[in-house]
């Protein structure tokens, strides 16, 4: 869509279907369509209200969405925890980045942010035990 928006001549010539992701077994969702798996919602980002802007913190995401949520979009990682009245644990997670390099569009304050992946263990009813794994650890263990 971004290429077509930048150059309308491409409209109808290229699209996500050309990538044949579904034919290769991928589940494909529309941008910002939350995907809920085991009572945890996943999205590129979650909105803070009717203006459609991204939430600014993991804590605010829990307050706005009332369920465990994991999102990308921002360079820094952020984690928040809450508990529902019924005792169910909730996780709010900004996943951060997985860059091995600095990005030109980032500032000196945001280049160098933590970079890695998250493993969600013991996922059940929206709760889990989150485990960060840094890119540095992965590179040391498995090589460049």
Feature roles, as predicted:
Residues 34-41:
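Beta-strand-turn-beta hairpins that frame and shape the catalytic cleft
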Residues 43-131:
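Conserved beta-sheet core of the metallophosphoesterase superfamily
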Residues 1-29:
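Active-site neighborhood of divalent metal-dependent phosphoester bond hydrolases
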Residues 129-144:
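Polar, enzyme-active/binding microenvironments
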Residues 30-34, 117:
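Short, acidic/polar N-cap/turn motifs at the starts of alpha helices
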């Amino acid at each position: 869509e971004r290429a077509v928006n930048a150059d309308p001549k491409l409209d109808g010539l290229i699209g996500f279907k050309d990538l044949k992701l579904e034919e290769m077994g991928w589940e494909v969702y529309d941008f910002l369509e939350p995907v809920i798996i085991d009572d945890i919602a996943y999205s590129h980002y979650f909105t803070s209200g009717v203006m459609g802007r991204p939430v600014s913190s993991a804590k605010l995401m829990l307050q706005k969405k009332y369920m465990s949520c994991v999102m990308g979009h921002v360079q820094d990682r952020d984690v928040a925890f809450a508990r529902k009245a019924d005792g169910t644990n909730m996780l709010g997670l900004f996943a951060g980045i997985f860059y091995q390099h600095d990005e030109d569009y980032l500032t000196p304050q945001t280049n160098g942010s933590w970079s890695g992946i998250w493993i969600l263990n013991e996922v059940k009813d929206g709760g889990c035990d989150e485990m960060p794994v840094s890119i540095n650890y992965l590179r040391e263990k498995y090589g460049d």
